[in-house]
A protein has these predicted regions:
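ABC-type nucleotide-binding domain
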Residues: 1-232
Length: 232
């Protein structure tokens, strides 16, 4: 029999909380968050939103609660505004501008000749990786979901943009649960709760400073990525 990708995982997240998930490649981080919108279903145990098992929600109702920002951004041919409205079809201009500002996309959009009416090529081939990620984040912000799920969605951003974007998101998501999967400790150091996965198991749960002392897997990742000053 095949061994499950994930086992013995228990955690909770409250509104207004940021919960981060980190671990080595192939440890099950993405699988864990893909269980929430039911891209997969659990084989044992359950995942509950507001006390209700996700399998008991109508799929559309469930997914309307969630803003899922995948690792690879999917953009289609159409204007920037069309791509952003994929998150909310009836979004007005004010909502587009607000979401773009939170996602740190506003400046590069305004630099385009046609701004929000600028055409995006199929797959977003006329945008950089970082611009595509910010478009994807803007699309989720415009939905104003109850749960944000970022699947390594800051990886193409430089550290400065990443930090500003997360600070803006924090202000915007006080009513929501934010789940972040990351490879980069810099993106999650200020999370309320960090879950460390190793080979499908939880090997640590806590804040950054605690985990540096108590979790060898986390400390190892931190040592490979952070400077002495950042570790202090």
């Amino acid at each position: 029999t095949k061994k499950p990708v994930l086992h013995d995982i228990t955690f909770s997240a409250k509104r207004g909380e940021t919960v981060a998930i980190i671990g080595s490649t192939g440890c099950g981080k993405s699988t864990l968050i893909q269980l929430i919108p039911r891209f997969y279903d659990v084989t044992e145990g359950s995942i509950k939103i507001d006390g209700v098992d996700v399998r008991n929600y109508d799929l559309e109702t469930l997914r309307n609660k969630i803003g899922f920002i995948p690792q690879k951004t999917i953009l289609f041919s159409g204007t920037i505004a069309d791509n952003m409205r994929f998150g909310k079809h009836d979004a007005n201009e004010k909502e587009l501008i607000e979401a773009a500002k939170v996602a740190q996309a506003y400046d590069f959009i305004m630099d385009k000749p046609d701004q929000f009416d600028e055409m995006v090529y199929e797959g977003g081939t006329n945008m950089s990786g970082g611009q595509k990620q910010r478009m994807s984040i803007a699309r989720a912000v415009i939905r104003n979901p109850e749960i944000y799920i970022f699947d390594d969605s800051f990886s193409a951003l430089d550290f400065k943009t990443d930090a500003i974007l997360r600070a803006e998101l924090k202000k915007e998501t006080t009513h929501a649960i934010v789940l972040i999967v990351a490879q980069r400790i810099g993106s999650i150091m200020d999370a309320d709760k960090i879950i460390v996965l190793d080979e499908g198991n939880v090997v640590g749960i806590g804040k950054h400073k605690e985990l540096l002392k108590t979790c060898s897997v986390y400390k190892e990742i931190a040592l490979s990525q952070l400077t002495e000053e950042e570790l202090a």
